Amino acid sequence: MVTKEQLKEKLKLYVILDRKLGNGVPLRQQAQLAIAGGATAIQLRDKEMKGRDYYQAALVIKDVCKENNVLFIVNDRLDVALAAEADGVHLGQEDLPLHAAKKLAPPGFIIGISAVNVEQAKLAEKGGADYLGVGDVFGTASKPDAKLTGVDMLKMICQSTSLPCVAIGGINVNNAKIVLDAGAIGIAVISAVVSQKDITGAAKALRELIP
């Protein structure tokens, strides 16, 4: 079971794997290369993968993360996260409600919640979430239709909660410092790492920006 301070350390560079944005690099290799560059957390995210395939992929990524003492989070699917013995799950506002997930989750299981405003952040904290994913901050290729949260709202959310806030959405080496200065304890990225030719180098460049 990780403490809140340990969790903050584990959430500093949160890399989300993506089959489509990974330029043909297998998910396992994406994880290995990102971790080699300093990723502290890995999330498996796939909106199209069937349950069985998602579970099999989760087992593979869990082993990579366990070998490297890196946090492993499954996106959306609590059933897959629990079956694969992941460290936790990340739930969006339209996914399984937090209170329902808490009933099923074992002690020490990490639950992250997406938040785009202060109200959502406060509800997540009250409901027992462990961290917040805040964004879409700058706009991103993985969610082209997402409404932008912006840096000002990110700052308001970070100030409104004691939960660790991880900024997400269009974050790269050029703007990472902006979200960290706004109060985020870490950054979550997809294309800024897994879409790059040098995944390890891209992760390393970002990790060096995070205190």
From Swiss-Prot:
<keyword id="KW-0479">Metal-binding</keyword>
<dbReference type="GO" id="GO:0005737">
    <property type="term" value="C:cytoplasm"/>
</dbReference>
<feature type="binding site">
    <location>
        <position position="114"/>
    </location>
    <ligand>
        <name>4-amino-2-methyl-5-(diphosphooxymethyl)pyrimidine</name>
    </ligand>
</feature>
<dbReference type="InterPro" id="IPR036206">
    <property type="entry name" value="ThiamineP_synth_sf"/>
</dbReference>
<comment type="similarity">
    <text>Belongs to the thiamine-phosphate synthase family.</text>
</comment>
<dbReference type="InterPro" id="IPR013785">
    <property type="entry name" value="Aldolase_TIM"/>
</dbReference>
<keyword id="KW-0808">Transferase</keyword>
<feature type="binding site">
    <location>
        <begin position="190"/>
        <end position="191"/>
    </location>
    <ligand>
        <name>2-[(2R,5Z)-2-carboxy-4-methylthiazol-5(2H)-ylidene]ethyl phosphate</name>
    </ligand>
</feature>
<dbReference type="InterPro" id="IPR022998">
    <property type="entry name" value="ThiamineP_synth_TenI"/>
</dbReference>
<keyword id="KW-0460">Magnesium</keyword>
<feature type="binding site">
    <location>
        <position position="170"/>
    </location>
    <ligand>
        <name>2-[(2R,5Z)-2-carboxy-4-methylthiazol-5(2H)-ylidene]ethyl phosphate</name>
    </ligand>
</feature>
<feature type="binding site">
    <location>
        <position position="76"/>
    </location>
    <ligand>
        <name>Mg(2+)</name>
    </ligand>
</feature>
<feature type="binding site">
    <location>
        <position position="95"/>
    </location>
    <ligand>
        <name>Mg(2+)</name>
    </ligand>
</feature>
<protein>
    <recommendedName>
        <fullName>Thiamine-phosphate synthase</fullName>
        <ecNumber>2.5.1.3</ecNumber>
    </recommendedName>
</protein>
<comment type="function">
    <text>Condenses 4-methyl-5-(beta-hydroxyethyl)thiazole monophosphate (THZ-P) and 2-methyl-4-amino-5-hydroxymethyl pyrimidine pyrophosphate (HMP-PP) to form thiamine monophosphate (TMP).</text>
</comment>
<keyword id="KW-0784">Thiamine biosynthesis</keyword>
<feature type="binding site">
    <location>
        <position position="143"/>
    </location>
    <ligand>
        <name>4-amino-2-methyl-5-(diphosphooxymethyl)pyrimidine</name>
    </ligand>
</feature>
<dbReference type="GO" id="GO:0004789">
    <property type="term" value="F:thiamine-phosphate diphosphorylase activity"/>
</dbReference>
<feature type="binding site">
    <location>
        <begin position="43"/>
        <end position="47"/>
    </location>
    <ligand>
        <name>4-amino-2-methyl-5-(diphosphooxymethyl)pyrimidine</name>
    </ligand>
</feature>
<dbReference type="Pfam" id="PF02581">
    <property type="entry name" value="TMP-TENI"/>
</dbReference>
<dbReference type="InterPro" id="IPR034291">
    <property type="entry name" value="TMP_synthase"/>
</dbReference>
<comment type="pathway">
    <text>Cofactor biosynthesis; thiamine diphosphate biosynthesis; thiamine phosphate from 4-amino-2-methyl-5-diphosphomethylpyrimidine and 4-methyl-5-(2-phosphoethyl)-thiazole: step 1/1.</text>
</comment>
<feature type="binding site">
    <location>
        <position position="75"/>
    </location>
    <ligand>
        <name>4-amino-2-methyl-5-(diphosphooxymethyl)pyrimidine</name>
    </ligand>
</feature>
<dbReference type="GO" id="GO:0000287">
    <property type="term" value="F:magnesium ion binding"/>
</dbReference>
<feature type="binding site">
    <location>
        <begin position="140"/>
        <end position="142"/>
    </location>
    <ligand>
        <name>2-[(2R,5Z)-2-carboxy-4-methylthiazol-5(2H)-ylidene]ethyl phosphate</name>
    </ligand>
</feature>
<dbReference type="GO" id="GO:0009229">
    <property type="term" value="P:thiamine diphosphate biosynthetic process"/>
</dbReference>
<dbReference type="GO" id="GO:0009228">
    <property type="term" value="P:thiamine biosynthetic process"/>
</dbReference>
